[in-house]
A protein has these predicted regions:
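Glycine-rich, flexible loop/turn motifs
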Residues: 24, 104, 138
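Acidic active-site catalytic centers that drive phospho-/nucleotidyl reactions
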Residues: 1, 42, 130
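Generic alpha-helical propensity signal that fires on short helical segments
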Residues: 46, 52-55, 101, 144-151, ...
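Acidic, His- and aromatic-enriched active-site or binding-groove loops in soluble protein domains
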Residues: 2-6, 101-120
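Active-site neighborhood of glycoside hydrolase catalytic domains
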Residues: 6-98
Length: 169
């Protein structure tokens, strides 16, 4: 439910989070493919790095949400399924969230850092939960959002607007 942002935890927002999370846990807890619950995507890492945080209360609110509120809800509604506070994480509390020897890591230097594919051979992560390289959608998909065949060019205005990574096209 949470990714790539920091939130001010007002009482109303906390109540909303609790209600929405309870609804989702009840809806999903019996699915055979559920391996674990994860509190958020990339937020522990970016808060630890000082990105996105504008005031100390946001760090406190982060800890309260992902290391207290959500675990309490899961203890009540799905105590059998493992909870991991963030991805990447080394287990929470901002304890080196990208440690390659504990928890999980996200490694995007090949894509975002323009390193060669062989760079993956330099690392032996305990668990790389995110990595990769972007590719184009299928031509059939491209035709669904382009009206003019000239827009099929990867440098066309339409294709550039569909690209969200600064190092792409």
């Amino acid at each position: 439910m949470f990714a790539c942002a920091v939130y001010d935890l007002t009482p109303d927002f906390e109540a909303n989070i609790r209600e929405e999370f309870i609804d989702n846990v009840k809806r999903l807890r019996h699915h055979a493919s559920l391996g674990l619950w994860c509190g958020n995507n990339e937020m522990e890492m970016f808060v630890k790095q000082g990105e996105w945080v504008t005031k100390p209360s946001e760090v406190r609110d982060y800890l309260f949400m992902y290391e207290r509120v959500i675990p309490e809800i899961l203890k009540k509604y799905d105590p059998e399924t493992f909870y991991w506070p963030a991805s990447p994480s080394s287990g929470g509390c901002f304890d080196d969230p990208s440690d390659p020897n504990r928890g999980d890591v996200h490694y995007w230097d090949v894509w975002h850092g323009n390193k060669p594919f062989s760079d993956y051979r330099n690392y032996y992560f305990r668990y790389a939960s995110e990595f990769g390289f972007q590719s184009f959608p299928s031509f059939e998909t491209i035709k669904t959002f382009t009206d003019d065949p000239a827009d099929w060019n990867i440098f066309s205005y339409v294709m550039e607007k569909h690209q969200r990574n600064a190092g792409a096209n």
